[in-house]
C-alpha cells in the first residue's frame, strides 16, 4: 500500500490518500485540542496510544457485528481504513450526565441516565457543532431518514458492547460520540474511538480517565489513557 498526498488535516489526525481509491491512511498525531481547537498542545505518546486503542475497539465492534472503516494497523501511529463518504453529523450516546448536557439542562454531573440518551450534533467547528434533530438532518440534506435509523441502531449496539467491555475493566462509559459514513452503499462506523471522543470514569472513585483531564487541567492525561488501555488489555 503506497502512501500518497495528505487529503485532510484535522485537529488530531491527518488523512492520506493511497494507491487504492477505496483506502486511506489515518495518522494519529500527538496534537491535543479542546474548545473547538482554541487550545492545542502536544502530548508525547498520544498518537500511538490512540491509534492502538482505536484499533482494539474497532476490532471488538467488528466482532460484535458493527461494520467499521478500520482495516489494519500499519505502525505505531498509522492505520489503514476504508474511504467513506462521511455524513456530517455526530451521534452522541450518554449513559451519565456530563459535558454539554449538564450545561444545557442544569443536571448534576454524574446523574445516571436510564435509559441512555441519543443526540445529534452538526459536525461544524465554525458553528460550534450545534445541537440538531433528525428533521434538520433530512431537511438540509446531511443524511436520509433511512441512514439516520441505521446510525441510531449502530450507536445503540456500540453502547451495548462497549458498556460491558469497560465495565469489566472497572470503568464507566459515561458518554461518547460516533461518526458514520457510507461505503459501497452501507452505513459504516468511521473516524475513531479513543479517550479523545468519549468519557470514561473509574467505577469506584469516579476519577476521570479521558480528555476531560486536558480540558479541565487535571494533568496526567496520557497516563490516564494508558491506564485505560492497560485495563482493557490493549497492546501498546
From Swiss-Prot:
Single GO MF descriptor: phosphoribosylaminoimidazolesuccinocarboxamide synthase activity
Gene Ontology CC terms: cytosol
Chain coiled-coil ranges: none
Domain of life where this protein originates: Bacteria
UniProt entry keywords in alphabetical sequence: ATP-binding, Ligase, Nucleotide-binding, Purine biosynthesis
Biological processes annotated in GO: 'de novo' IMP biosynthetic process; cobalamin biosynthetic process
Gene3D superfamilies given in the database record: ATP-grasp fold, B domain, Phosphorylase Kinase, domain 1
Catalytic activity entry: 5-amino-1-(5-phospho-D-ribosyl)imidazole-4-carboxylate + L-aspartate + ATP = (2S)-2-[5-amino-1-(5-phospho-beta-D-ribosyl)imidazole-4-carboxamido]succinate + ADP + phosphate + 2 H(+)
Pathway: Purine metabolism; IMP biosynthesis via de novo pathway; 5-amino-1-(5-phospho-D-ribosyl)imidazole-4-carboxamide from 5-amino-1-(5-phospho-D-ribosyl)imidazole-4-carboxylate: step 1/2
Keyword Repeat annotated: no
Pfam families: SAICAR_synt (PF01259)
EC number from the UniProt entry: 6.3.2.6
NCBIfam families assigned to the protein according to its UniProt record, in alphabetical order: purC
Protein family per UniProt: Belongs to the SAICAR synthetase family.
This protein's name: Phosphoribosylaminoimidazole-succinocarboxamide synthase
